[in-house]
A protein has these predicted regions:
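Conserved catalytic/switch belt of AAA+ P-loop NTPases
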Residues: 82-100, 114
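Short regulatory helix/loop adjacent to the ATP-binding pocket of P-loop NTPases
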Residues: 106-121, 138
């Protein structure tokens, strides 16, 4: 097993909550993580038809006849089980009684909100971070990581990426989207998924998507929500603050995994990647998605934004996670050299927001990080390897 940064945080959460749920995209390593983190717990996988039937027919006996130290995988397959978990956890009032995970996050989280609110700690396990992937492949470059992505099976079993991602997309569309989310036009949804990849790093304009697909605004809005709830994509909202300026109000679109993004863009080699017209947007996606992982792995909620105003002043990432009053401003560039002009917008916005010099960063593919007058020039590799202190 590739060591996961979230392992210790899952174990800590089990000391705080009677129930811990690990969510995340398909095949991000949830089952492996919880079994590794809690080796003494009984493991039940409701993919097993017999166990699933028991849990649905008689949830009381399913729980009462077993130890209270249980891992229940694919728990969403037994919705009536959640009320029983609530009863037992309220009776015993002991932390760490049940560990839940599942691949249909929208169903799992719905049940948790309905029956286990306040009783369950919910953690998000995304695909491997660059730091975690290096544990399996120490010579992995950031370009190779962008192309491969972070799904563990690609790094420990060395499955060919084209085979893995084709299977992944098919499973996602045929099982999650078709079976559980009542999407009827799967061919159009597949086209929609590729269209999202082609608009990575751009503003989410549902009307434009609807026109390109020949469908309705409401359908596109619903499908965007599906992609986010299943951890395929996420939106980066614009920064507002208390500025007396006209600011963009539309969020930007990014993918949680650049390997899947590259697959959808039909990028098959590092050379293809570096020559692709969206290379800059993919690097931008990498830095932002890795920042999201870093915070989730430390049990922190990312407060990330971008800035754009009507004067065409824009900064790729405004990180308010540590401070609302002094956010970190990060401009992301795909080149291998730093030029002072890269920092022009950083300086403009720093003045508006009263951001100190230490919080201005240009991230690019330079070999080493350094300071240039009032700007931090960070190697993207160094930025990706940055650590985050977990919640105390």
């Amino acid at each position: 097993m590739i060591p996961r940064l979230l392992t210790e945080q899952v174990q800590r959460s089990a000391a705080w909550f009677p129930i811990v749920s690990v969510t995340g995209p398909r095949q991000s390593g949830k089952s492996t993580l919880v079994q590794h983190a809690f080796p003494d717990y009984a493991y039940l996988n409701l993919e097993n038809p017999e166990l699933r039937n028991q849990a649905n027919v008689d949830p009381i006996s399913f729980i009462r006849d077993r130890s209270t130290h249980l891992i229940i995988d694919e728990a969403q397959y037994a919705p009536d089980l959640f009320s029983m978990l609530q009863v037992v956890s309220d009776e015993t009032k002991q932390p760490g009684q049940f560990i839940l995970s599942g691949s249909q996050n929208f169903l799992l989280l719905r049940q948790i909100k309905q029956s286990l609110a306040g009783r369950a700690g919910v953690l998000k396990l995304l695909p491997l971070s660059y730091t975690e992937a290096l544990a399996a492949q120490p010579e992995l470059t950031i370009e190779e990581f962008m192309l491969t992505g972070g799904y563990p099976h690609l790094h420990d079993a060395h499955v060919p990426r084209s085979i893995f991602f084709e299977s992944y997309v098919n499973s996602y569309i045929e099982r999650d989207v078709a079976d559980y989310l009542d999407v009827r036009n799967l061919t159009m949804f597949r086209t929609f998924l590729r269209l999202c990849a082609q608009h990575v790093g751009g503003l989410i304009k549902e009307t434009t998507f609807a026109n390109e697909l020949g469908t309705t605004y409401r359908t596109v809005k619903s499908w965007m929500s599906i992609l986010e709830s299943s951890y395929i994509t996420f939106s980066l909202p614009p920064y507002y603050g208390n500025l007396n300026k006209r600011l963009t109000k539309t969020p930007k679109l990014y993918f949680h995994d650049t390997g899947l993004l590259c697959h959808l863009l039909r990028i098959n080699t590092v050379q293809d990647l570096q020559e692709h017209p969206l290379f800059g947007e993919i690097i931008e996606n990498l830095v932002i998605s890795e920042t999201v992982k870093r915070y989730y792995n430390a049990l922190k909620t990312p407060e990330l934004y971008f800035y754009r105003d009507d004067s065409k002043i824009e900064v790729d990432l405004v990180d308010c996670t540590h401070s609302q009053t002094e956010p970190e401003l990060i401009e992301i560039k795909s080149g291998r050299m730093y030029h002072d002009r890269f920092a022009k917008h950083l300086r403009s916005i720093s003045t508006l927001l009263n951001v100190p010099d230490d919080n201005r960063t240009v991230a690019t593919r330079v070999d080493r990080s350094y300071t240039d007058h009032d700007v931090n020039v960070r190697s993207i590799r160094d930025l990706l390897l940055q650590t985050e202190e977990p919640v105390a």
